[in-house]
Amino acid sequence: AEDRSSLSGVSDAEAKEFHALFVSSFTAFIVIAVLAHVLAWAWRPWIPGPKGWA
């Protein structure tokens, strides 16, 4: 049987490389999502003001 140090079978260097890519991709996704929400809010706010939707 092979001696594996991890359940996934990837080396520590491969895991760190994947983690760095995952974190950068997730960060980019969050930035794009926040920007989209800000633009949508500027276009059409989804919480009514003090006078309602009028």
Swiss-Prot record:
GO biological process, one term: photosynthesis, light reaction
Top-rank taxon, per record: Bacteria
Entry keyword annotation includes Transmembrane: yes
Record keywords: Antenna complex, Bacteriochlorophyll, Cell inner membrane, Cell membrane, Chlorophyll, Chromophore, Light-harvesting polypeptide, Magnesium, Membrane, Metal-binding, Transmembrane, Transmembrane helix
Assembly and binders: The core complex is formed by different alpha and beta chains, binding bacteriochlorophyll molecules, and arranged most probably in tetrameric structures disposed around the reaction center. The non-pigmented gamma chains may constitute additional components.
Official protein name in the record: Light-harvesting protein B-880 beta chain
Membrane protein topology class: Single-pass type II membrane protein
Record topology, Periplasmic segments: 44-54
The family this protein is said to belong to: Belongs to the antenna complex beta subunit family.
InterPro entries in the record: Antenna_a/b, Antenna_beta_CS, Antenna_beta_dom_sf, LHB-1/5, Light-harvesting_complex
Cellular component terms per the entry's GO annotation: plasma membrane; plasma membrane light-harvesting complex
Cytoplasmic side, ranges: 1-20
